[in-house]
Amino acid sequence: MAIEGVMKEGFVTTTYDSVVNWAKTGSLWPMTFGLACCAVEMMHAGAARYDIDRFGMLFRPSPRQSDLMIVAGTLCNKMAPALRKVYDQMPEPRWVLSMGSCANGGGYYHYSYSVVRGCDRIVPVDVYVPGCPPTAEALLYGVIQLQQKIRRTNTIARA
């Protein structure tokens, strides 16, 4: 958060945008959408060794309580409408993190008739995390990239 100035009486001046974006980055509540083996690495990121909670993230079971969806694994044609429905139930502002080669572009099953070649064909994706499966460190790096993207956006002031 950029602080523009500190006055004599202990007041801090900054913009409203930077305060709102700081609060958003410190309280991302992801909803897990684990479809395959990448979901296991997502569970590792939530466990004690990597502790995704230190970034202010709290896994939520309901789309109405979350603002980040982590799509982890192979997205089949039959599951695509459910993914879109869950995405539409999330409140604004909402972000999507695509985790793994299968979610990014179909992965190993790219040429299968039943696989969607990337979840970005169904929902808009903000951050792509590569790997098969990506490690928990890669997921944490993707979360940090998303936080930096949120800090760069204008919430109130339009450019």
Curated annotation (Swiss-Prot):
The keyword Glycosyltransferase does not apply. Keywords: 4Fe-4S, Cell inner membrane, Cell membrane, Iron, Iron-sulfur, Membrane, Metal-binding, NAD, Quinone, Translocase, Transport, Ubiquinone. Its EC number is 7.1.1.-. It comes from the Bacteria. Pfam families: Oxidored_q6. It is a peripheral membrane protein. It catalyses: a quinone + NADH + 5 H(+)(in) = a quinol + NAD(+) + 4 H(+)(out). GO terms for biological process: aerobic respiration; electron transport coupled proton transport. It is found in: Cell inner membrane. InterPro entries: NADH_UbQ_OxRdtase-like_20kDa (IPR006137), NADH_UQ_OxRdtase_20Kd_su (IPR006138). PROSITE patterns: COMPLEX1_20K. Its cofactor is [4Fe-4S] cluster. One of its GO terms (molecular function) is NADH:ubiquinone reductase (non-electrogenic) activity. One of its GO terms (cellular component) is plasma membrane. It is an enzyme of class 7 (translocase). [4Fe-4S] cluster binds at residues 37-38, 102, 132. Gene3D superfamilies: 3.40.50.12280. Binds 1 [4Fe-4S] cluster. NDH-1 is composed of 14 different subunits. Subunits NuoB, C, D, E, F, and G constitute the peripheral sector of the complex. Belongs to the complex I 20 kDa subunit family. NDH-1 shuttles electrons from NADH, via FMN and iron-sulfur (Fe-S) centers, to quinones in the respiratory chain. The immediate electron acceptor for the enzyme in this species is believed to be ubiquinone. Couples the redox reaction to proton translocation (for every two electrons transferred, four hydrogen ions are translocated across the cytoplasmic membrane), and thus conserves the redox energy in a proton gradient. This is NADH-quinone oxidoreductase subunit B. It comes from Variovorax paradoxus (strain S110).
